[in-house]
Amino acid sequence: MRAAWGSVWCLCLAAAVGALPAARRRGAERSGGQAAEYLRSETAFLEELVFGSGDTIELSCNTQSSSVSVFWFKDGIGIAPSNRTHIGQKLLKIINVSYDDSGLYSCKPRHSNEVLGNFTVRVTDSPSSGDDEDDDDESEDTGVPFWTRPDKMEKKLLAVPAANTVRFRCPAGGNPTPTIYWLKNGKEFKGEHRIGGIKLRHQQWSLVMESVVPSDRGNYTCVVENKYGNIRHTYQLDVLERSPHRPILQAGLPANQTVVVGSNVEFHCKVYSDAQPHIQWLKHVEVNGSKYGPDGTPYVTVLKTAGVNTTDKELEILYLRNVTFEDAGEYTCLAGNSIGFSHHSAWLTVLPAEELMEMDDSGSVYAGILSYGTGLVLFILVLVIVIICRMKMPNKKAMNTTTVQKVSKFPLKRQQVSLESNSSMNSNTPLVRITRLSSSDGPMLANVSELELPPDPKWELARSRLTLGKPLGEGCFGQVVMAEAIGIDKDKPNKAITVAVKMLKDDATDKDLSDLVSEMEMMKMIGKHKNIINLLGACTQDGPLYVLVEYASKGNLREYLRARRPPGMDYSFDTCKLPEEQLTFKDLVSCAYQVARGMEYLASQKCIHRDLAARNVLVTEDNVMKIADFGLARDVHNIDYYKKTTNGRLPVKWMAPEALFDRVYTHQSDVWSFGVLLWEIFTLGGSPYPGIPVEELFKLLKEGHRMDKPANCTHDLYMIMRECWHAVPSQRPTFKQLVEDLDRVLTMTSTDEYLDLSVPFEQYSPAGQDTHSTCSSGDDSVFAHDLLPDEPCLPKHVPCNGVIRT
């Protein structure tokens, strides 16, 4: 191809190693604008050359004189030789090209500003196949590009904390294969436009920005085009700054203490701080008979401060040995960082030994009087209640009738659940029918065989074909035992398989029976899925109610992961015992993927779990994850949320804020719990929010705190966790999206990528219980702090004559 400018001729040669890229002619409108920006020439059009990533580019400028040497420019900037770029007298050669090599190239004589040639180079992962001459040979499916995964592009607004990684995707297809480039706020976006650079993964149609900052906010548009046209899609990015904060001190610590003279005293102070805190213990003193200075600040002495060999954990405890009366007074824990200071105070009261004994004696007398008085009042109250009950008690026949009426209000009807049932029973048939009651009074049903359920031929199993075995565990209203069942597999009626059998305890109530029946019916209607515990059958006739479900030999996921922690680490249960099997990173991703699939199925059946956690996921012999415990599950076919009305035990550390504070349960609140379950998986069964008391957790969640990334978790997976923990429920991903994301991660993960277990898991140790345990500050914090509260703090202290004034 030749183009003439006056008497000068330019020859452009383009060659690629391994494959010859195609050249496509662009219109004068687009190319001419770029030429005018960088070049002083009268070019009528630009020639665009398309190369594949990794190819070699060769551009040549020919002049009438063979002795003329030329300079080369890219986007108006001179090109210097490098290990990839070779410059000859008239030749420019670039090897192993990448997307960053795309741009406008020009050549000029060494002693002239006259442009001899210019070329537009675009580098893609998949170069276009064919020249304009080949258009007639293209298939009938040619046309404008199209989106291949529009469902992955529905979330247009992305709000992330600063320092996170952001990934935008625009999966597309077309014939000829389209190319993609990106705009920010309407202008072309390249790596040099951002301090941290960008990653353009053309095969995945994605733009990746690591460690985002507030200046990255804006609208990002992907433009996908081929010669038939283009399509575009815009994402909006909002980067949230992490607010710096002064330390947070746990409420109630240090606590007031009263001791006898000569005792030893410990004051505790729990500090939470994003930045490294500086902790001091102060004692309030008097100077010239006054506790406060002229400016109103208290006089204090420093009892304990950071030293060369002290740790934050040591500084959180103040020890006083063999206290005297002079030690009585006010003590303050002062914690500060680069942002500010926070403090909590407590009083120490020191009593003489005899006074404390007198107090104990007088206290014993008062306690005795109080206990006797309380006992007398309770006795009289019980006596009155018994008399009233006997006065109102009818004859035996009337009593039986009344009891039957009371319990007959209990039977459930299938019409109460709006899910479509596959059961063969009539929709109005009561699930429980009363036949007779024992003579025992009260609502306790010690002999549950006195309640009959109509048989369901599809699920009924004769008791003679069931052999009960060892207990497996106990639930809220019943127990689970292992059993051998014959006839579960209809194709092999004589084959025995191992099952788990749910049954009521001996002291079960009618409400307990209602819950078990409801769970059985729910499992019937939800149907079967590989990643949930499925119903296998039931024994409802001639005896207690038995519900047969799948048996998972490896127990729950939490214990499964903990049993496979490596030996020799301080977080391993038994350092002498080798783990049962070594887990790879892909094994952990597979666990998460399977649970997500099970939850996707439950969500499709309009079922909200409300108690999703690793302890409620069971593992089979073949390492298949199965979601269990539908006891808290509820049908929400007609409504999209469920408000809990009872005050039963709730798994607060797995609960979404809207469920925790407003008792509103949706599929999005299950997604939050799934994020916590992901954290459990990648800490090999760690306890969420280790060392954080429940009361403190409420406050921290309201302030936007989230758990930090586990040591063996990739940044992409941690981003999935953080998306699950979005404060706005509607901004969390759906389980369908989670399945797709985890499937992608699973596909890209190596099968032999073993965990880097050289990093200790101190903050995920089993010692970190879910109750009121301690937590160190600084690097041991499990929180990523977003927004934090204002707290009163002491002014910065200054030395004053050997006494610290604050």
Swiss-Prot record:
<comment type="similarity">
    <text>Belongs to the protein kinase superfamily. Tyr protein kinase family. Fibroblast growth factor receptor subfamily.</text>
</comment>
<feature type="region of interest" description="Disordered">
    <location>
        <begin position="121"/>
        <end position="146"/>
    </location>
</feature>
<feature type="domain" description="Ig-like C2-type 2">
    <location>
        <begin position="150"/>
        <end position="238"/>
    </location>
</feature>
<feature type="disulfide bond">
    <location>
        <begin position="269"/>
        <end position="333"/>
    </location>
</feature>
<feature type="binding site">
    <location>
        <begin position="472"/>
        <end position="480"/>
    </location>
    <ligand>
        <name>ATP</name>
    </ligand>
</feature>
<dbReference type="GO" id="GO:0005886">
    <property type="term" value="C:plasma membrane"/>
</dbReference>
<feature type="glycosylation site" description="N-linked (GlcNAc...) asparagine">
    <location>
        <position position="96"/>
    </location>
</feature>
<keyword id="KW-1015">Disulfide bond</keyword>
<feature type="signal peptide">
    <location>
        <begin position="1"/>
        <end position="19"/>
    </location>
</feature>
<feature type="modified residue" description="Phosphotyrosine; by autocatalysis">
    <location>
        <position position="754"/>
    </location>
</feature>
<feature type="active site" description="Proton acceptor">
    <location>
        <position position="611"/>
    </location>
</feature>
<keyword id="KW-1133">Transmembrane helix</keyword>
<feature type="glycosylation site" description="N-linked (GlcNAc...) asparagine">
    <location>
        <position position="219"/>
    </location>
</feature>
<dbReference type="InterPro" id="IPR036179">
    <property type="entry name" value="Ig-like_dom_sf"/>
</dbReference>
<keyword id="KW-0675">Receptor</keyword>
<keyword id="KW-0812">Transmembrane</keyword>
<keyword id="KW-0808">Transferase</keyword>
<dbReference type="InterPro" id="IPR000719">
    <property type="entry name" value="Prot_kinase_dom"/>
</dbReference>
<dbReference type="GO" id="GO:0030154">
    <property type="term" value="P:cell differentiation"/>
</dbReference>
<keyword id="KW-0418">Kinase</keyword>
<keyword id="KW-0597">Phosphoprotein</keyword>
<dbReference type="InterPro" id="IPR013151">
    <property type="entry name" value="Immunoglobulin_dom"/>
</dbReference>
<dbReference type="Pfam" id="PF21165">
    <property type="entry name" value="FGFR3_TM"/>
</dbReference>
<feature type="topological domain" description="Extracellular">
    <location>
        <begin position="20"/>
        <end position="364"/>
    </location>
</feature>
<comment type="subunit">
    <text>Monomer. Homodimer after ligand binding.</text>
</comment>
<dbReference type="InterPro" id="IPR003599">
    <property type="entry name" value="Ig_sub"/>
</dbReference>
<feature type="modified residue" description="Phosphotyrosine; by autocatalysis">
    <location>
        <position position="642"/>
    </location>
</feature>
<dbReference type="GO" id="GO:0008284">
    <property type="term" value="P:positive regulation of cell population proliferation"/>
</dbReference>
<keyword id="KW-0067">ATP-binding</keyword>
<dbReference type="GO" id="GO:0043235">
    <property type="term" value="C:receptor complex"/>
</dbReference>
<keyword id="KW-1003">Cell membrane</keyword>
<comment type="function">
    <text>Tyrosine-protein kinase that acts as a cell-surface receptor for fibroblast growth factors and plays an essential role in the regulation of cell proliferation, differentiation and apoptosis. Plays an essential role in the regulation of chondrocyte differentiation, proliferation and apoptosis, and is required for normal skeleton development. Regulates both osteogenesis and postnatal bone mineralization by osteoblasts. Promotes apoptosis in chondrocytes, but can also promote cancer cell proliferation. Phosphorylates PLCG1, CBL and FRS2.</text>
</comment>
<feature type="transmembrane region" description="Helical">
    <location>
        <begin position="365"/>
        <end position="389"/>
    </location>
</feature>
<dbReference type="GO" id="GO:0005007">
    <property type="term" value="F:fibroblast growth factor receptor activity"/>
</dbReference>
<feature type="glycosylation site" description="N-linked (GlcNAc...) asparagine">
    <location>
        <position position="83"/>
    </location>
</feature>
<dbReference type="GO" id="GO:0008543">
    <property type="term" value="P:fibroblast growth factor receptor signaling pathway"/>
</dbReference>
<keyword id="KW-0547">Nucleotide-binding</keyword>
<feature type="modified residue" description="Phosphotyrosine; by autocatalysis">
    <location>
        <position position="718"/>
    </location>
</feature>
<dbReference type="InterPro" id="IPR017441">
    <property type="entry name" value="Protein_kinase_ATP_BS"/>
</dbReference>
<feature type="domain" description="Ig-like C2-type 1">
    <location>
        <begin position="24"/>
        <end position="124"/>
    </location>
</feature>
<dbReference type="InterPro" id="IPR011009">
    <property type="entry name" value="Kinase-like_dom_sf"/>
</dbReference>
<dbReference type="InterPro" id="IPR001245">
    <property type="entry name" value="Ser-Thr/Tyr_kinase_cat_dom"/>
</dbReference>
